[in-house]
UniProtKB/Swiss-Prot annotation:
Belongs to the SNAP-25 family. Residues 196-258 form the t-SNARE coiled-coil homology domain. GO terms for biological process: autophagosome maturation; autophagosome membrane docking; cilium assembly; exocytosis; membrane fusion; protein transport; synaptic vesicle fusion to presynaptic active zone membrane; synaptic vesicle priming. The lineage of its organism: Eukaryota, Metazoa, Chordata, Craniata, Vertebrata. It comes from Homo sapiens (Human). It comes from the Eukaryota. This is Synaptosomal-associated protein 29.
Protein backbone atom coordinates (compact mmCIF):
# COMPACT_ATOMS: atom_id res chain seq x y z
CA UNK A 1 0.00 0.00 0.00
CA UNK A 2 1.35 3.44 -0.92
CA UNK A 3 2.69 5.67 1.85
CA UNK A 4 1.20 8.75 0.18
CA UNK A 5 -2.44 9.81 -0.05
CA UNK A 6 -4.23 8.91 -3.23
CA UNK A 7 -4.13 12.56 -4.36
CA UNK A 8 -0.77 14.33 -4.22
CA UNK A 9 1.37 16.38 -6.57
CA UNK A 10 4.67 14.65 -7.45
CA UNK A 11 6.07 17.96 -8.80
CA UNK A 12 6.03 19.37 -5.26
CA UNK A 13 8.27 16.59 -3.87
CA UNK A 14 11.45 18.40 -4.93
CA UNK A 15 10.59 21.54 -3.00
CA UNK A 16 9.43 19.76 0.21
CA UNK A 17 11.44 18.60 3.22
CA UNK A 18 11.69 14.88 3.75
CA UNK A 19 9.36 15.02 6.75
CA UNK A 20 6.73 17.17 5.08
CA UNK A 21 3.48 15.75 3.84
CA UNK A 22 2.91 15.62 0.08
CA UNK A 23 0.98 18.58 -1.31
CA UNK A 24 -2.47 17.79 -2.72
CA UNK A 25 -3.25 18.27 -6.39
CA UNK A 26 -4.11 21.85 -7.14
CA UNK A 27 -6.92 20.84 -9.47
CA UNK A 28 -10.60 21.69 -9.15
CA UNK A 29 -11.67 18.07 -9.58
CA UNK A 30 -8.85 16.78 -7.34
CA UNK A 31 -8.47 13.89 -9.75
CA UNK A 32 -11.20 11.63 -8.34
CA UNK A 33 -10.94 7.86 -8.52
CA UNK A 34 -12.67 6.17 -11.37
CA UNK A 35 -12.14 4.82 -14.84
CA UNK A 36 -11.10 8.29 -16.10
CA UNK A 37 -8.53 8.90 -13.33
CA UNK A 38 -5.44 7.88 -15.38
CA UNK A 39 -6.53 10.07 -18.29
CA UNK A 40 -7.22 12.98 -15.94
CA UNK A 41 -3.82 12.56 -14.32
CA UNK A 42 -2.11 12.46 -17.71
CA UNK A 43 -3.98 15.57 -18.85
CA UNK A 44 -2.97 17.43 -15.71
CA UNK A 45 0.67 16.44 -16.19
CA UNK A 46 0.56 17.72 -19.76
CA UNK A 47 -0.87 21.02 -18.57
CA UNK A 48 1.74 21.27 -15.83
CA UNK A 49 4.62 20.61 -18.26
CA UNK A 50 3.21 23.17 -20.68
CA UNK A 51 2.78 25.74 -17.92
CA UNK A 52 6.34 25.28 -16.71
CA UNK A 53 7.71 25.47 -20.25
CA UNK A 54 5.81 28.73 -20.77
CA UNK A 55 7.20 30.14 -17.51
CA UNK A 56 10.74 29.13 -18.49
CA UNK A 57 10.38 30.75 -21.91
CA UNK A 58 9.13 33.95 -20.30
CA UNK A 59 12.00 33.88 -17.80
CA UNK A 60 14.64 33.51 -20.53
CA UNK A 61 13.00 36.36 -22.45
CA UNK A 62 13.27 38.61 -19.40
CA UNK A 63 16.90 37.59 -18.92
CA UNK A 64 17.56 38.37 -22.57
CA UNK A 65 16.01 41.82 -22.20
CA UNK A 66 18.15 42.53 -19.12
CA UNK A 67 21.24 41.37 -20.98
CA UNK A 68 20.56 43.77 -23.85
CA UNK A 69 19.90 46.58 -21.37
CA UNK A 70 23.25 45.86 -19.72
CA UNK A 71 24.87 45.89 -23.14
CA UNK A 72 23.37 49.32 -23.88
CA UNK A 73 24.80 50.63 -20.61
CA UNK A 74 28.18 49.14 -21.51
CA UNK A 75 28.15 50.79 -24.94
CA UNK A 76 27.17 54.16 -23.44
CA UNK A 77 29.97 53.90 -20.86
CA UNK A 78 32.45 52.96 -23.60
CA UNK A 79 31.44 55.95 -25.71
CA UNK A 80 31.86 58.21 -22.68
CA UNK A 81 35.34 56.77 -22.18
CA UNK A 82 36.13 57.56 -25.82
CA UNK A 83 35.00 61.18 -25.32
CA UNK A 84 37.10 61.40 -22.18
CA UNK A 85 40.11 60.17 -24.15
CA UNK A 86 39.59 63.01 -26.62
CA UNK A 87 39.53 65.55 -23.78
CA UNK A 88 42.74 64.15 -22.31
CA UNK A 89 44.53 64.17 -25.67
CA UNK A 90 43.47 67.75 -26.41
CA UNK A 91 44.59 68.81 -22.94
CA UNK A 92 47.96 67.14 -23.45
CA UNK A 93 48.37 68.92 -26.77
CA UNK A 94 47.55 72.28 -25.15
CA UNK A 95 50.13 71.66 -22.44
CA UNK A 96 52.73 70.82 -25.11
CA UNK A 97 51.88 74.06 -26.92
CA UNK A 98 52.19 76.06 -23.69
CA UNK A 99 55.58 74.48 -23.07
CA UNK A 100 56.77 75.48 -26.56
CA UNK A 101 55.52 79.05 -26.09
CA UNK A 102 57.24 79.24 -22.72
CA UNK A 103 60.55 78.16 -24.25
CA UNK A 104 60.24 80.94 -26.85
CA UNK A 105 59.51 83.45 -24.09
CA UNK A 106 62.58 82.32 -22.19
CA UNK A 107 64.70 82.88 -25.31
CA UNK A 108 63.38 86.42 -25.58
CA UNK A 109 64.10 87.10 -21.93
CA UNK A 110 67.65 85.81 -22.26
CA UNK A 111 68.17 88.01 -25.33
CA UNK A 112 66.89 91.13 -23.59
CA UNK A 113 69.46 90.68 -20.81
CA UNK A 114 72.22 91.75 -23.14
CA UNK A 115 71.99 95.23 -24.62
CA UNK A 116 74.17 94.48 -27.59
CA UNK A 117 73.49 90.82 -27.99
CA UNK A 118 69.80 91.22 -27.45
CA UNK A 119 68.88 92.79 -30.76
CA UNK A 120 71.31 90.62 -32.71
CA UNK A 121 70.10 87.41 -31.15
CA UNK A 122 66.48 88.46 -31.47
CA UNK A 123 66.64 88.95 -35.23
CA UNK A 124 69.24 86.25 -35.81
CA UNK A 125 67.40 83.48 -34.07
CA UNK A 126 63.75 84.10 -34.67
CA UNK A 127 61.35 81.71 -32.99
CA UNK A 128 61.00 78.57 -35.00
CA UNK A 129 57.38 77.79 -35.64
CA UNK A 130 56.72 74.22 -34.76
CA UNK A 131 54.35 72.51 -37.19
CA UNK A 132 51.18 71.21 -35.59
CA UNK A 133 51.27 67.58 -34.64
CA UNK A 134 49.41 65.26 -36.93
CA UNK A 135 47.50 63.78 -34.01
CA UNK A 136 45.84 67.12 -33.40
CA UNK A 137 44.11 67.04 -36.78
CA UNK A 138 42.59 63.62 -36.23
CA UNK A 139 39.48 62.74 -34.29
CA UNK A 140 40.30 60.87 -31.12
CA UNK A 141 39.43 57.19 -31.32
CA UNK A 142 39.27 54.52 -28.62
CA UNK A 143 41.49 51.47 -28.85
CA UNK A 144 40.65 49.01 -31.63
CA UNK A 145 39.36 46.37 -29.23
CA UNK A 146 36.80 48.70 -27.69
CA UNK A 147 35.92 50.23 -31.05
CA UNK A 148 35.08 46.80 -32.51
CA UNK A 149 33.09 45.82 -29.41
CA UNK A 150 30.99 49.00 -29.62
CA UNK A 151 30.35 48.50 -33.34
CA UNK A 152 29.33 44.85 -32.90
CA UNK A 153 26.98 45.63 -30.00
CA UNK A 154 25.28 48.45 -31.89
CA UNK A 155 24.68 46.21 -34.91
CA UNK A 156 23.20 43.49 -32.70
CA UNK A 157 21.03 46.00 -30.82
CA UNK A 158 19.44 47.11 -34.10
CA UNK A 159 18.69 43.49 -35.00
CA UNK A 160 17.26 42.84 -31.55
CA UNK A 161 14.95 45.85 -31.69
CA UNK A 162 13.69 44.70 -35.08
CA UNK A 163 13.03 41.11 -33.99
CA UNK A 164 11.80 41.81 -30.43
CA UNK A 165 9.42 44.79 -30.59
CA UNK A 166 8.20 45.65 -27.08
CA UNK A 167 9.59 42.34 -25.81
CA UNK A 168 6.63 40.50 -27.29
CA UNK A 169 5.37 37.68 -25.04
CA UNK A 170 5.15 34.14 -26.25
CA UNK A 171 1.57 32.93 -26.69
CA UNK A 172 -0.43 30.49 -28.76
CA UNK A 173 -0.90 32.91 -31.64
CA UNK A 174 2.80 33.76 -31.86
CA UNK A 175 4.60 30.72 -30.50
CA UNK A 176 8.10 31.20 -31.89
CA UNK A 177 9.85 32.86 -34.83
CA UNK A 178 10.04 30.59 -37.83
CA UNK A 179 13.34 28.85 -38.21
CA UNK A 180 14.39 29.33 -34.60
CA UNK A 181 14.97 25.62 -34.18
CA UNK A 182 16.51 25.02 -37.58
CA UNK A 183 19.91 24.36 -36.04
CA UNK A 184 18.55 21.27 -34.27
CA UNK A 185 16.70 18.25 -35.56
CA UNK A 186 12.94 18.43 -35.10
CA UNK A 187 13.18 15.01 -33.43
CA UNK A 188 14.92 16.68 -30.49
CA UNK A 189 11.75 18.62 -29.61
CA UNK A 190 8.42 17.37 -28.23
CA UNK A 191 5.71 16.50 -30.72
CA UNK A 192 3.17 18.77 -29.05
CA UNK A 193 3.25 21.93 -31.22
CA UNK A 194 2.82 24.35 -28.30
CA UNK A 195 5.42 22.62 -26.14
CA UNK A 196 7.78 22.41 -29.11
CA UNK A 197 7.36 26.15 -29.69
CA UNK A 198 8.26 26.90 -26.07
CA UNK A 199 11.33 24.65 -26.23
CA UNK A 200 12.47 26.29 -29.44
CA UNK A 201 11.95 29.72 -27.90
CA UNK A 202 13.97 28.74 -24.84
CA UNK A 203 16.83 27.42 -27.00
CA UNK A 204 16.76 30.56 -29.13
CA UNK A 205 16.86 32.82 -26.06
CA UNK A 206 19.70 30.83 -24.51
CA UNK A 207 21.70 31.06 -27.74
CA UNK A 208 21.20 34.83 -27.82
CA UNK A 209 22.14 35.08 -24.14
CA UNK A 210 25.35 33.17 -24.79
CA UNK A 211 26.33 35.44 -27.68
CA UNK A 212 25.31 38.54 -25.73
CA UNK A 213 27.45 37.58 -22.75
CA UNK A 214 30.36 37.18 -25.16
CA UNK A 215 29.78 40.71 -26.45
CA UNK A 216 29.58 42.03 -22.89
CA UNK A 217 32.91 40.37 -22.17
CA UNK A 218 34.46 42.06 -25.23
CA UNK A 219 33.12 45.43 -24.07
CA UNK A 220 34.54 44.89 -20.58
CA UNK A 221 37.97 43.90 -21.92
CA UNK A 222 37.94 46.84 -24.34
CA UNK A 223 37.06 49.24 -21.51
CA UNK A 224 39.85 47.79 -19.40
CA UNK A 225 42.38 48.39 -22.19
CA UNK A 226 41.02 51.91 -22.76
CA UNK A 227 41.28 52.77 -19.07
CA UNK A 228 44.86 51.50 -18.95
CA UNK A 229 45.79 53.62 -21.98
CA UNK A 230 44.11 56.68 -20.48
CA UNK A 231 46.00 56.08 -17.25
CA UNK A 232 49.22 56.33 -19.29
CA UNK A 233 48.00 59.61 -20.79
CA UNK A 234 47.21 60.94 -17.31
CA UNK A 235 50.68 59.98 -16.08
CA UNK A 236 52.30 61.79 -19.01
CA UNK A 237 50.03 64.78 -18.54
CA UNK A 238 50.81 65.00 -14.83
CA UNK A 239 54.55 64.94 -15.52
CA UNK A 240 54.24 67.61 -18.22
CA UNK A 241 52.09 69.88 -16.03
CA UNK A 242 54.55 69.61 -13.14
CA UNK A 243 57.42 70.47 -15.48
CA UNK A 244 55.45 73.36 -16.97
CA UNK A 245 54.71 74.72 -13.51
CA UNK A 246 58.43 74.74 -12.65
CA UNK A 247 59.29 76.49 -15.93
CA UNK A 248 56.60 79.14 -15.41
CA UNK A 249 57.96 79.98 -11.95
CA UNK A 250 61.48 80.14 -13.36
CA UNK A 251 60.34 82.49 -16.13
CA UNK A 252 58.60 84.75 -13.60
CA UNK A 253 61.81 85.07 -11.61
CA UNK A 254 63.76 85.98 -14.75
CA UNK A 255 61.21 88.63 -15.69
CA UNK A 256 61.47 90.24 -12.25
CA UNK A 257 65.24 90.36 -12.58
CA UNK A 258 65.09 92.42 -15.78
Amino acid sequence: MSAYPKSYNPFDDDGEDEGARPAPWRDARDLPDGPDAPADRQQYLRQEVLRRAEATAASTSRSLALMYESEKVGVASSEELARQRGVLERTEKMVDKMDQDLKISQKHINSIKSVFGGLVNYFKSKPVETPPEQNGTLTSQPNNRLKEAISTSKEQEAKYQASHPNLRKLDDTDPVPRGAGSAMSTDAYPKNPHLRAYHQKIDSNLDELSMGLGRLKDIALGMQTEIEEQDDILDRLTTKVDKLDVNIKSTERKVRQL
